[in-house]
């Protein structure tokens, strides 16, 4: 911790500098170990850095190699060149540092951080370039190079697999890797810089392969990093293979690279202090300067630096976790553990890692710089950094505050690292020897503290530590990891791990930052601990985790937020996720996972790096499931996917799980999620928004959209929530490591199992991990990283949570990183969408989409536990919604956190699965649905509130994996701090809610407009009196009541619990009942309720509800009642779902409710005097009208029966229905107007008047146009069709103008059309719509509530105006013939008697209407025309004969536009005159329209009075 004291708080921030240098050294350490001691680490998957069989030796080798590579190794030179190439790839020339850390005062050109690190570590000015590591001699690349050959064989998946077991195989495969590295050093080292960086990135992005097969994959990547890079994108399987050793090697670099590249290009500026704030920048600059001076020394310990870098790399290119722990080995090991993952990743993705630095806690984003390719690494770092920057920027201040204040002087980087370290520290206390170190990640955490002891502690890390120690234990020791990535990122500023973590928190998707932060601490400690995910972090824990603890305990003003943001951000999202998201395209495959998972790779790293013990289970974990069992790609996809999902380190699938767990454990611990985390009330610190004040800064980083999206957490609370969430998720992984730490050996085995679960389990959990994320910590973080990120990355917050199931496949389609760090790694593809999604879901964005898919669950989970990383369990859901909750964890929150640690939300395999058994048990224990809703609910509530849009879909989509994740996100009810916390994730459609308010707005506008017709108070009083002005009643009933009812029905539960009957149906009236219980302020409401309830006339709940609204308007209390209801949350909770309008009014859309109240206010100023039984009276009057109409019809039938034939003939032939039409038109227009007029009462009145006119003065009416009455009745009887029939109701000849087309049957003017004898025009008037006719007939206008639909009314008016004159006469005639209500209607026309008419079936099917053939209709027409009584009788006898005695020219007019929908049908336009060729059975007529002929529906045509003088109008 020599360096840490130096950099205390400042270093932390500075360490956000790209981890490239650090990672490079670490990688180089691996490379050195693998390359220098090539024979030592031939292990293909065993990235020399990570898979160090001989902890001390390997570490030393790694360090030495790292430095030598950085400075002098051929690989170094190649790397320098490759670095340049890589940079070029990244769009940065050798001279264009990916991340020029503004704070790197060193001449390190664009990449002072790396150069400085290396210069400091190596003391080689030549290494000055920030990418000097890459350029000078990047042992990491070397390592990759060495590893390349194995990768060659194992290229692709095998390495991915290897990578997964990087930690496991680290020791075993270290030699092969070293050999490979050595081999590759010459050949591939040249290409390696690029490839390596890319591979790193890929590894980081690519999950299992990159991380798990760190040794082999990295090797391959080292060998042909360029190819690998290509492979990364083209050959996912191969990249993972490539990822083996090189991956691990590159892991740090890769992590750094990816994160860095991503950050660099996207938002490294943000990542560094540069983007944080001026103050932070200054601090970072100061830190960096300090670090550059002394930190140079620290950097000089390249292995340590690299380790730190790998941790930091995960965070951001610019974010260099100043791992103040003086254990170079640890940092190295951590680095290597990260590195193996990184290497695996790198291998998996050739160069992709370069694009997005690994997400090792902070090293993640730096590793690319260190490793394969300065350019690629830079790119990776830039991408990652950018992605992270988005997250980190938002959390940056947060981290800075925490880092600077919380981070004790010993570990400034610790602040970022401390975030991680804190987690680690919590885990650190039990830095168990092998797997345990994983759990006690914190012990592993001190990058600079115990190089060799740590290696022992971290069996997996031990290899890495050995490499680190061997290479530069001395150098590393006492060196602060000032992983100041050169300004590879756009900003090239140095970020603290805390910042990274914060970043990752904010964009949960960005595992990169989190990974970086965690990666630095975790990775460094995760070489051995990688297997025991916790083990790696524990090392750092000493330096950072403990600091974090102390900080937390102390007050953690700086630290808690730091940890919250750093832990979550760095571990969960920022480093890997960011990088991966940013690096989306390049890191498609394992790289992203690796990137995202670097912390997790700690587990794999431990596996890979861990001593043989570590390697065994590491192999088991990484190698067995990933390397061996699964094809590198598949395994990597599977393992890494889950791991990646769990932890960006996922690239080293097996290791990744461990890493994920380690990282997670560290995070969990830091978050209070870890076992140790529990002891340390980390949540208190996390809850404590130490950096929250800074969080409000939402930096719009200039990284591409992806990054911005990932970091699109806008508010401080959101940011905090994200970081908390990140931490929350991290805690799960960390908790798993913690658990494993508890069971180091078992953990090792479980971790092996876990990696296996991650690998195999990933494959198998591929399907299951997502849904069942058993591993509490591992699963939690990974899910958050992998699932959401992967899916989110993949689908940009879609429920790509299922990637775990699809992981083997998804790894290629959705590279493992896509799961673990998809968001960060795949930023290009996924992050942008995520960003968009986040834009859509502001809260959702941070909650669900924080950085990508993972953020949904992770970020959002973070939101849940953002303040409650520690108390994630209890306060998680609640925290998500309430930052304050995040600040203080209740015992419940603690319980929940512990619970969550034990039962992570992540997929079982996906989670680091440090403890597979615990994972499975947790899976069994966890009720995904039960758990998820709480966290998600809080988060979703938060999201809903912030975003209010489709929040629910996001939670489910964004949740890391699938609904299962979302469901599991919710803490158990017992852990819920509040009902909100326990509520399930809700999706609130703000548009729909706005629609509800809009409906009320329209109703109020109409009512106000009604009253606005006059300013006279007296007139207004009348306008408000429903008795005087029924229109007001109609407006209220037709618009306001439905609108209010819709508001009350929105989200209304189907049932409410009832003491007596258990449950009863819930309805708006139930809400009214509950809200009007007698009380001091509800006496009036209660009285109104009682009054309405006592009306026997109000027979339905709807009628009672409408009456209640009318009463509220009368007492001007509608707004008051709504406000009263709103204030009674108990009523709302009882009756409404969380997504209901009234429920959402308390959470997501309070503004809409305020708007609703404002809209209702004007109603309290209007003088309403509404009859509470207005609706009832309307209905009653409608019935009366119908009855009256029926009576009128009967009487008129009798009156007209004698004259019907004569008048029909006259109207048809002689008078030319003009006169009758006119007379009738007046009548009919009046009637139609009434009916059309639209309002029930008015229509009723008009109807009554018309009816009276027609019926009462039958003969007078005859005088007016005797049939006008009939027409009117007909119109009313078939009001529904009036509009259509108005046009076609003028059948001069058939006179049976079925007023509607539907009545066409009745008005079978044309013989073909001749409707069946209209048994009752009213009843059977409509050919097709007989039922409508019947309804119209039965209910009359009242059926329409006084008015037909607006469209109908408008059409009626139009048609009335156009056809009124012509139609009226025809209809009058028709009326005469049709009016008889019964089947005798036609009979009436022919003199039939009422009895006959009654005898006729009232409802005759349209098919029966035309039972008579055309000849029969003609006969009837002749009979009618000649006034032959016998014929009429016949027609009477044959109800069908009543077919209008249509004139020979049987023509019908189309009442509407019709497109033939079947063969043989005829298309026509409204008003077209169709010649009837004959009846076609059923409701069809065969008609011809010009040259075309076909079937025409009876209902669509009406008889056309050919002779009629007004055929034109009738045609209209």
UniProtKB/Swiss-Prot annotation:
Identify residues that carry Phosphoserine: 536, 543, 559, 656, 781, 1368, 1380
Which InterPro entries does this chain map to?
Run_dom, Run_dom_sf, RUN_RUSC2, RUSC1_2, SH3-like_dom_sf, SH3_domain
Q: Which domain of life is it from?
A: Eukaryota
Compositional bias segments (type: Acidic residues): 1237-1251
UniProt keyword list: Cell membrane, Cytoplasm, Disease variant, Intellectual disability, Membrane, Phosphoprotein, SH3 domain
Where would you find the membrane-spanning parts of this chain? Answer: none
* Assembly with partners or alone: Associated component of the adapter-like complex 4 (AP-4). Interacts with active RAB1A and RAB1B, and with GOLGA2. Interacts (via RUN domain) with RAB35 (GTP-bound form); the interaction recruits RUSC2 to the plasma membrane.
- Describe the disease involvement stated in the record for this chain: Intellectual developmental disorder, autosomal recessive 61: A disorder characterized by significantly below average general intellectual functioning associated with impairments in adaptive behavior and manifested during the developmental period. MRT61 patients manifest delayed psychomotor development, moderate to severe intellectual disability, and variable dysmorphic facial features. Refractory seizures and brain abnormalities are present in severely affected patients.
Q: What is this protein called?
A: AP-4 complex accessory subunit RUSC2
């Amino acid at each position: 911790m020599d360096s840490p004291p130096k950099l205390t708080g400042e270093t932390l921030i500075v360490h956000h500098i790209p981890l490239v240098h650090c990672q490079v050294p670490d990688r180089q350490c691996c490379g050195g170990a693998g390359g220098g001691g090539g024979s030592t680490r031939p292990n293909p998957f065993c990235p020399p850095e990570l898979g160090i069989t001989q902890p001390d030796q390997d570490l030393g080798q790694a360090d030495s190699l790292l430095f030598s590579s950085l400075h002098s190794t051929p690989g170094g030179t190649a790397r320098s060149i490759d670095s340049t190439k890589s940079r070029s790839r990244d769009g940065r020339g050798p001279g264009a540092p990916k991340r020029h850390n503004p704070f790197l005062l060193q001449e390190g050109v664009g990449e002072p951080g790396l150069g400085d690190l290396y210069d400091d570590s190596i003391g080689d000015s030549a290494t000055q370039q920030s990418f000097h590591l890459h350029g000078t001699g990047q042992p990491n690349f070397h390592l990759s190079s060495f590893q390349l050959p194995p990768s060659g064989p194992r290229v692709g998946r095998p390495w991915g697999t290897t990578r997964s077991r990087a930690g496991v195989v680290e020791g075993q495969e270290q030699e092969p890797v070293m050999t490979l590295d050595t081999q590759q050093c010459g050949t591939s080292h040249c290409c390696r810089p690029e490839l390596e960086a890319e591979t790193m990135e890929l590894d980081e992005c690519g999950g299992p392969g990159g991380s798990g097969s760190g040794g082999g994959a990295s090797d391959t990547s080292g060998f042909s990093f360029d190819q690998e890079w290509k492979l990364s994108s083209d050959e996912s399987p191969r990249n993972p293979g490539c990822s083996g050793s090189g991956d691990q090697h590159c892991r740090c670099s890769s992590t750094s690279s990816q994160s860095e590249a991503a950050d660099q290009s996207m938002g490294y500026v943000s990542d560094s202090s540069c983007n944080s704030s001026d103050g932070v920048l200054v601090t970072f600059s100061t830190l960096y300067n300090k670090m550059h001076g002394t930190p140079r020394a620290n950097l000089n310990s390249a292995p340590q630096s690299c380790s730190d870098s790998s941790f930091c790399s995960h965070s951001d290119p610019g974010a260099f976790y100043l791992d103040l722990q003086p254990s170079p080995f640890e940092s190295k090991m951590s680095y290597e553990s990260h590195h193996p993952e990184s290497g695996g990743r790198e291998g998996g993705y050739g160069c992709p890692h370069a694009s997005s630095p690994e997400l090792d806690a902070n090293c993640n984003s730096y590793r690319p710089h260190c490793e394969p390719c300065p350019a690629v690494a830079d790119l990776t770092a830039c991408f990652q950094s950018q992605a992270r920057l988005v997250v980190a920027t938002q959390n940056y201040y947060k981290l800075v505050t925490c880092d600077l204040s919380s981070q004790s002087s010993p570990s400034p980087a610790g602040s970022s690292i401390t975030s991680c370290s804190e987690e680690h520290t919590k885990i650190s206390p039990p830095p168990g020897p092998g797997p345990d170190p994983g759990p006690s990640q914190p012990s592993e955490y001190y990058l600079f503290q115990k190089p060799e002891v740590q290696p022992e502690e971290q069996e997996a890390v031990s290899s890495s530590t050995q490499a680190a120690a061997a290479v530069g234990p001395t150098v590393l020791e006492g060196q602060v990891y000032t992983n100041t990535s050169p300004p590879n990122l756009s900003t090239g500023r140095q970020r603290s791990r805390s910042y990274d973590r914060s970043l990752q928190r904010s964009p949960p998707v960005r595992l990169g930052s989190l990974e970086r932060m965690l990666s630095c601490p975790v990775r460094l400690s995760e070489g051995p601990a990688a297997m025991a995910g916790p083990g790696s972090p524990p090392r750092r824990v000493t330096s950072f985790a403990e600091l974090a603890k102390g900080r937390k305990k102390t007050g953690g003003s700086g630290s808690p937020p730091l940890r919250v943001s750093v832990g979550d951000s760095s571990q969960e999202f920022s480093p890997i996720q960011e990088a991966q998201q940013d690096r989306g395209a390049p890191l498609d495959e394992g790289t992203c996972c690796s990137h995202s998972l670097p912390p997790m790779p700690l587990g794999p790293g431990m596996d890979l790096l861990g001593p043989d013990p570590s390697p065994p289970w590491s192999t088991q974990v990484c190698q067995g499931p990933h390397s061996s069992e699964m094809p590198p790609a598949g395994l990597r996809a599977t393992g890494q996917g889950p791991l990646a999902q769990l932890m960006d380190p996922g690239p080293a699938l097996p290791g990744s799980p461990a890493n994920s767990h380690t990282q997670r454990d560290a995070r969990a611990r830091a978050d209070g999620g870890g076992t140790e985390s529990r002891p340390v009330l980390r949540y208190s610190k996390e809850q404590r928004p130490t950096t929250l004040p800074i969080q409000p800064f939402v930096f719009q980083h200039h990284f591409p959209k992806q990054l911005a999206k990932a970091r699109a957490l806008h508010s401080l609370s959101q940011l905090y929530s994200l970081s908390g969430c990140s931490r929350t998720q991290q805690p799960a992984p960390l908790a798993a490591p913690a658990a494993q730490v508890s069971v180091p050996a078992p953990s090792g085995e479980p971790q092996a199992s876990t990696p296996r679960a991650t690998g195999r389990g990933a494959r198998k959990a591929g399907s299951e991990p997502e849904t069942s994320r058993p591993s509490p910590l591992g699963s939690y973080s990974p899910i958050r990283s992998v699932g959401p990120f992967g899916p989110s990355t993949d689908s940009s917050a879609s429920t790509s949570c299922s990637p775990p199931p699809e992981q083997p496949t998804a790894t290629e389609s959705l590279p493992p990183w896509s799961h673990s760090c998809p968001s960060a790694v795949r930023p290009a593809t996924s992050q942008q969408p995520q960003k968009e999604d986040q834009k859509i879901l502001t809260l959702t964005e941070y909650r669900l989409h924080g950085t990508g898919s993972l953020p949904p669950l992770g970020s959002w989970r973070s939101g849940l536990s953002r303040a409650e990383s520690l108390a994630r369990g209890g306060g998680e859901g609640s925290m998500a919604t309430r930052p304050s909750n995040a600040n203080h964890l209740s015992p419940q929150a603690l319980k929940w956190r512990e619970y969550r640690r034990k039962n992570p939300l992540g997929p079982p395999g996906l989670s680091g699965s440090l403890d597979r058994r615990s994972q499975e048990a947790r899976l069994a224990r966890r009720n995904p649905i039960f758990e998820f809703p709480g966290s998600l609910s809080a988060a979703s509530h938060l999201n809903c509130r912030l975003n209010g849009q489709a929040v629910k879909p996001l939670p489910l989509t964004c949740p890391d994996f699938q609904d299962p994740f979302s469901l599991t996100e919710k803490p158990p009810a017992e852990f819920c701090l509040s009902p909100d916390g326990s509520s399930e994730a809700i999706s609130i459609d703000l548009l729909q809610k706005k629609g509800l308010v809009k409906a009320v707005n329209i109703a109020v506008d109409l009512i106000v407009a009604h009253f606005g017709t006059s300013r006279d108070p007296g007139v207004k009083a009348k306008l408000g009196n429903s008795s005087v002005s029924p229109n007001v009643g109609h407006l209220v009933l037709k618009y306001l009541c439905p609108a209010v009812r819709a508001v009350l029905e929105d989200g209304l539960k189907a049932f409410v619990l009832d003491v007596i009957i258990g449950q009863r149906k819930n309805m708006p009236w139930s809400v009214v009942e509950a809200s009007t219980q007698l009380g001091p302020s509800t006496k009036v409401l209660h009285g109104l309720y009682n009054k309405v309830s006592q009306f026997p006339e109000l027979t339905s709940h709807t009628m009672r509800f409408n009456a209640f609204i009318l009463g509220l308007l009368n007492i001007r209390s509608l707004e008051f009642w709504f406000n009263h209801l709103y204030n009674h949350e108990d009523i709302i909770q009882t009756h409404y779902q969380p997504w209901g309008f009234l429920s959402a009014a308390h959470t997501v859309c309070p503004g809409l409710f305020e708007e609703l109240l404002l809209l209702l206010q004007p109603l309290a100023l209007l003088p309403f005097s509404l009859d509470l039984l207005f609706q009832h009276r309307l209905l009653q009057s409608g019935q009366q009208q119908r009855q009256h109409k029926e009576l009128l019809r009967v009487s008129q039938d009798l009156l007209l029966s004698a004259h019907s034939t004569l008048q029909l003939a006259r109207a048809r032939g002689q008078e030319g229905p003009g006169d009758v039409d006119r007379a009738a038109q007046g009548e009919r227009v009046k009637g139609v107007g009434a009916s059309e007029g639209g309002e029930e009462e008015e229509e009723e009145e008009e109807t009554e008047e018309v009816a009276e006119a027609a019926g009462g003065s039958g003969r007078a009416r005859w005088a007016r146009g005797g049939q006008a009455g009939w027409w009117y009745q007909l119109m009313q009887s078939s009001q529904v069709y009036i509009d259509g029939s108005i046009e076609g109701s003028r059948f001069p000849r058939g006179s049976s103008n079925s007023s509607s087309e539907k009545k066409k049957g009745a008005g079978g003017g044309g013989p073909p059309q001749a409707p069946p004898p209209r048994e009752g025009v009213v009843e059977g008037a409509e050919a097709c719509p007989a039922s409508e006719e019947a309804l119209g007939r039965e209910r009359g206008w009242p059926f329409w509530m006084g008015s037909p639909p607006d469209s109908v009314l408008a059409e009626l008016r139009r048609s009335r105006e156009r056809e009124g004159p012509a139609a009226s006469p025809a209809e009058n005639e028709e009326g005469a013939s049709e009016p008889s209500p019964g089947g005798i209607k036609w009979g009436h026309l022919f003199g039939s008697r009422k009895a006959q008419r009654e005898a006729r079936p009232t409802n005759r099917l349209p098919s029966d209407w035309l039972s008579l053939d055309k000849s029969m209709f003609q006969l009837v027409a002749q009979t009618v025309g000649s006034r032959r009584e016998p014929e009429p009788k016949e027609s009477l006898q044959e109800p069908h004969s009543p077919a209008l005695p249509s004139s020979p020219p049987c023509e019908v007019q189309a009442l509407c536009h019709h497109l033939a929908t079947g063969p043989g049908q005829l298309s026509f336009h409204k008003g077209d005159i169709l010649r009837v060729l004959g009846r076609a059975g059923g409701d069809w007529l065969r008609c011809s329209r010009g040259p075309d002929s076909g079937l025409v529906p009876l209902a669509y045509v009406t008889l056309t009075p050919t002779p009629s003088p007004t055929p034109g109008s009738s045609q209209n």
